[in-house]
Each structure stands twice: as C-alpha cells, then as structure tokens.
Amino acid sequence: MSRFFSSNYEYDVASSSSEEDLLSSSEEDLLSSSSSESELDQESDDSFFNESESESEADVDSDDSDAKPYGPDWFKKSEFRKQGGGSNKFLKSSNYDSSDEESDEEDGKKVVKSAKEKLLDEMQDVYNKISQAENSDDWLTISNEFDLISRLLVRAQQQNWGTPNIFIKVVAQVEDAVNNTQQADLKNKAVARAYNTTKQRVKKVSRENEDSMAKFRNDPESFDKEPTADLDISANGFTISSSQGNDQAVQEDFFTRLQTIIDSRGKKTVNQQSLISTLEELLTVAEKPYEFIMAYLTLIPSRFDASANLSYQPIDQWKSSFNDISKLLSILDQTIDTYQVNEFADPIDFIEDEPKEDSDGVKRILGSIFSFVERLDDEFMKSLLNIDPHSSDYLIRLRDEQSIYNLILRTQLYFEATLKDEHDLERALTRPFVKRLDHIYYKSENLIKIMETAAWNIIPAQFKSKFTSKDQLDSADYVDNLIDGLSTILSKQNNIAVQKRAILYNIYYTALNKDFQTAKDMLLTSQVQTNINQFDSSLQILFNRVVVQLGLSAFKLCLIEECHQILNDLLSSSHLREILGQQSLHRISLNSSNNASADERARQCLPYHQHINLDLIDVVFLTCSLLIEIPRMTAFYSGIKVKRIPYSPKSIRRSLEHYDKLSFQGPPETLRDYVLFAAKSMQKGNWRDSVKYLREIKSWALLPNMETVLNSLTERVQVESLKTYFFSFKRFYSSFSVAKLAELFDLPENKVVEVLQSVIAELEIPAKLNDEKTIFVVEKGDEITKLEEAMVKLNKEYKIAKERLNPPSNRR
C-alpha cells in the first residue's frame, strides 16, 4: 500500500533528505526572486503575514509539537512549508540563518548555469585532463582533449563569445608540453603519431592566436581573472554581427574570423545567411588584394550553399553571386602579375599565410574560378526550367544568358594568360570550351556572331586568345572557324564523352546553318552513334536532337527519301518529347524514382528556347510519308509489286486507314488533318488541292527558308501526283498523251517523260514510249479492272454465304 494512505507509516529522515532533493533548482530561483520582492513590501503587509504565520505555528505547536511533516507540501524543506514546524525564510520574522543555505549548496545542490558557463566548465575539464595526461606522457589523451577544446572554441566563436582565456591557457599548456618532450623518447608508434599530430595542431592554433599567446606569456595571472581573452581591436575597428543578430558585436582579427566561417561551412546548425552577412562585412574592411581574394573564394560558394535545398537559386541571390564572381575576376585581372588562382596550385596550411612566390614572382592560390561560373550557369538553367516558358518572366530571365557567356569567355582568357604548362592549360580549358559550345551550338550564325561581339567588347585589351582570336571577328567565316576549332580541340581529349559531345555540337551546327551532306558525312565518319546508349542521358538527348536536326536539314533541301529514312526510327517512339529532353521538369520529378537527384532530373530536360518544335517534326515526317507512300499504295492496289516501306505508327498510311473508317469526315482542323486531306487529293491526281492544303499548315513559318522549301515541295507534289495518276488509271487507258499529262500537272513534257520512264523501268510496268516520244502505250497486264475486282469479291462472298446456309449433309 502507498505510504500516502498508510495510517502507521513511519517517516524516515533519510528518505526525507533524498526526497528534498526533488525540489528543482528552477523552483529555488523562483522562490528566491520572490523573497527579494517581499522585502520591499510595506510594513503593514509584513505584519499581516507575520501574524498569520505565528498563528499557524502556534496551532501546530499546541496540537502536535512532535508530529512528522504532513500535508500537500510534506516533501519540501521546513523553511518552504506553510505548515509543519519550519518558519518561512522569506518572512522578516523568521529565524532563518543564511548559513543553512550555504550548507545546502555545499551538499551538492544543482545550480542553473548559462550555456556560456557550461562551455567554460567543459574547457576547464579539458585543462585538468591534459594536466593529468601530461604527467604520464599520455599523448593520445592530450591529442583527443586538444581536439575537443578546438571544437568547443568553434562553438564559442559561432555564438560570438570571443576566445576564452582558458583556451589560451590550454594552448600554452600543450605548447609547453610539446617543447619539453623529445620524440625520440616515445617508443610507442601510436603515442609518437599522436605527439606529431598534436605538435602540428598546436603550432597552427598558436599562430592564429599569436597576440593572445604573447599576452599570456607576459602575464599568465591575468588570464585567471577574466572569463574571456581580450583581443586587441584591429586598426580597422570593424564589428561582426552575431549569428542571431541580437548578440553584442565583437571585434576579431580578419583571418581568424574568416577561418571560423570556413570551419562552420557545411554544418546543419549554421545559419548560412549569417555567414554571408559576415563575409560581406569582412569585404568592407579588407585592404590587401589577398584578403579580397580569400574572402570572395569563401563568399561565392557560401551563396550557393544557402540555396542548395531550393529548386534554383533566387534571382536576386544569383545576381549577387554573378557580381561577386565579376569582382573577383576584376581583382585577379588587376593583380595578375602578383596573385593567380588556379586548380593546380599547392594548398597552404594557414589561411593567413600568403603562398610563396614562384620563379616568376607570382603567388599562386588554390581555387577553381570556373567551378563558380559553372555552378552559376547551372543555377541559371534550373531557373529557366522552373519558370513558365510562355510568360514574360522567361524572356526577362533569358537576357542573363549573355552575362553568363561573358563570364565563360573571361575565364577562358584568364586561364590562357596564367597557365604556362600546355598540359594544364588543355585540362583547364576543356570545361569552358564545352560551356561555350553548349550556349551557341543550337543558334543561327547571326545570333552567335552577336553574342561573340558583345562578349569580346567587355574583355580588357591585354587579353588575347590563340584558340578563338578576336581579330577574325569581322570575317564571314568567324563562326564556322569558332565552332570547328573548339570542337577539334575537345575531340582530342582523352574523355570519350567529351569527344562525342564536341562532335555532336559541330554536327548540329552544321546541319542547322550549313550543308546537310557535310553534316551527314561527319556523323557517319565519326561513328559517334557507337555505344551511345551507354552514356549519360544528356548525351543521348543531344544525339537524338542531332538526328532530328539532320532530318530537318534534308527536308529543307527537299531530300524527301533521306529525311524520311532519318526520322522514321526516331518518330516510331511513342515518347518523342522525352527522348528529345523537351518534357517539363515537374513531369520528370513525378515520373523519376526517389533515388534520382535534382541534378540528374535537370539533365533530362532542356530549357524551352532550345526545344525543336514537335509540330514541325510531325508535319515534316507526315509530308515525307505522303510523298513516298501515296504513290506506292496506289501502285500496290493496282496489282504492281512494290518494295515494302518500313512500318511507322505515324505514317500517312495508318492515318488514311483510320480516316476511312470514320462515320463523319469534317473539314481539316489539325496539321495532321491538312496532310491527310492533301493525301486524299493526291490519290485523285488533284495536285493543286494537295499543295493548297499543305501551304495552309502554319508550322512552315518556323523554317528559315519557308518559301524556297514550299516551292520545292510543290514541284515534288506535282511529280508524285503524276505517278499516282498513272498507277491509278493505267488499267483503264491503253495510252497516255505526254502533252495532256504535262498540261494536267503543269510540268514540262521532258519532265513527264523522264518521270514515267523511270517508274516503268523500276517497277517493270508493261508500258513503253513511242518513237515520237508523245504517247505512252500501256500493254494489257495481269491486273484486273475495278469492275472485275468487284465481281471477284462478290463471288467470294456468295460462296461463303451459300456454304453457311446449306451445309453439306456428311459434315459432322
């Protein structure tokens, strides 16, 4: 039974003392605060409480002077109970002795400490453990504890508490221990390794806190009195805001604060915007070029880290990153003879130590300028993928492409000016060359020249390029030489993916702006299609785009058979939009697996302005199918043996079969309907209506040479309509007049003769041209007339019906 309900429960003093500990320290603070307030009350109030208290005490004493504590506050100390023998220490009349409180605190009572006090206590514990380990030469413990106090210092500086004195004492303590120990005396390999590690770390930390260490050496006792080390205010007198914006500003050394920010990057508890604000303040007080360079090399990636979890970097932050990269390049351009940043420099141990000068008097700093430009370009592309392409925001955002291209060119020229080793230069220029081609390969020649001119106009005069010279900018072949030169350099790289990408860029540009046959030969000789399925999705999408552009290039020259052959396999796919990278990013995110990262999904789609119009692709393929399949279909139905055409679900033959089954056939509405009506007119030999339907398709306006293409298309429709007419009516006529056919299809007589003779020879049709070349005489062949065909069909159906109505008697 619980003691609360037991009548004979004996109160145990020992349990009472343990139960008294249940009173939390927060309650004591609350009561002590109320005690200080009660002392300021009026005397009348005090007398009132004193009287009531004395009465209650008298009652208790008279009733049960020896009774144990009882009531709802039985577990409290006597001075806190309203009843039960002890007087309240908060009342003036109580005989409370302050020595009781001191004794209670000495008995191990918990005291509420601030986070700063707890951190200082942890540092003090480290100091004590290192002191003990120093006596036994336990360098493993010293190394671990010195590691711990370094992490505690980072926590203190993140909260802008400065550098505690105890930390300086520990550094001095470990430094003295290192100096007093000889490595030869350490026989254990693990201990010797820990000694070397500690020696390097304490050397670095001591140099970072050189001023504080000097003060400690001069006056060690002063560091026992103050809670934190007082660092001298720098000459610049700048202040750094706290991470929360509410703590008091502190003044610290430039590189000490910069090192703290570098150590804080990547931690989940760090406020990225606070780091950016701190770095921006550091830039306002930087004086030397080295300080500016190191601050920008830290600030730029910090801006990208701040938006790492977003779909794309906000435009205002993107422009800030762009400005920072531009300023960094400007500083590097101005100090190119003194400081250079590249990926092949040696790392430095201490950020405040400038690199040593090489034989040319240049201090080389480890860093990747183009990684910033590349990340900026990726964020730009992501923003285009997430903005509505049909809105004005997309066009406004697209204007920044020129700025990105300018940075790419500036970075390329900086590499050419700073890297002397040819091997290093080729490695460094690979990525800028790929990015330049990525921004221009799909554009027309005029647009590329405009971009190049604008980019070169902002380049300082002292920068020259041996790969893409500015001197040839006014020549007519500048763009061709640019694309070919960049592609040739990249095709010599060891990376096979880069080689294939460079070749595909060149083929696409050639097919779009130049000659189809040249682009086709480049594709066949390069063997770029070999194992293309084994490469990443972006390269496969580029290959599919090249194939489509090659087909469109053939169509512009009215090479119908070539165009149909190129596009047939690609358009047989039911996911044309996906294989061309033209689906929306949102749709990819819904269909992708959970393992696919955001970057992988972004590589599977292209911005809207790079898309190839799908309607144009469809109408080109349907038109090619119309000109090839309609004459062959007519010849086949006329009993002529023709070569089978590869099947395609988007062919005009399938559309006609579906159209003939419709119960209602309305006027044309879609582009497929217009091509379908053009096919029906061609079957009748009416080439004028066929051309009229084709010309009403609005997608032709996307072709740069629309009128030239339509004129060539008209001539081809006339020829194919002539073939269709000849196949349809040769079984009804014994001869065809060349003059009549020329008048009917608006073709020269020699053209009519040439077309029909080639058809007769190819398909082995029993017909020939007379000696005067005016009449085609058709011999009677094996084909049957329409009337005979109908009779055969009717006779077959009659036999089937007769057998069904009158089955044989012996049939089981």
From Swiss-Prot:
Cellular component terms (Gene Ontology): cytoplasm; cytoplasmic stress granule; eukaryotic 43S preinitiation complex; eukaryotic 48S preinitiation complex; eukaryotic translation initiation factor 3 complex; multi-eIF complex
Keyword Protein biosynthesis annotated: yes
Amino acid composition bias (Acidic residues), ranges on this chain: 18-30, 38-64
Superkingdom of this protein's organism: Eukaryota
Miscellaneous comment: Present with 78900 molecules/cell in log phase SD medium.
Quaternary structure note: The eukaryotic translation initiation factor 3 (eIF-3) core complex is composed of TIF32, PRT1, NIP1, TIF34 and TIF35. A subcomplex of TIF32, NIP1 and PRT1 mediates the interaction with eIF-1, TIF5/eIF-5 and HCR1. The factors eIF-1, eIF-2, eIF-3, TIF5/eIF-5 and methionyl-tRNAi form a multifactor complex (MFC) that may bind to the 40S ribosome. TIF32, NIP1 and TIF5/eIF-5 comprise a minimal 40S-ribosome-binding unit. NIP1 interacts with TIF5/eIF-5 and SUI1.
Residue ranges constituting the PCI domain according to the UniProt record: 608-783
Protein's cellular compartments: Cytoplasm
Chain's gene name: NIP1
Residues bearing the modification Phosphoserine: S98, S99, S103
Function recorded in the entry: Component of the eukaryotic translation initiation factor 3 (eIF-3) complex, which is involved in protein synthesis of a specialized repertoire of mRNAs and, together with other initiation factors, stimulates binding of mRNA and methionyl-tRNAi to the 40S ribosome. The eIF-3 complex specifically targets and initiates translation of a subset of mRNAs involved in cell proliferation.
Keywords assigned by UniProt, alphabetized: Cytoplasm, Initiation factor, Phosphoprotein, Protein biosynthesis
InterPro entries the record matches: EIF3C (IPR027516), EIF3C_N_dom (IPR008905), PCI_dom (IPR000717)
Single GO molecular function: mRNA binding
Principal cellular location given in the protein's record: cytoplasm
Name of protein: Eukaryotic translation initiation factor 3 subunit C
Region Disordered: start-end pairs: 1-110
Similarity comment: Belongs to the eIF-3 subunit C family.
One of the GO BP terms on file: translational initiation
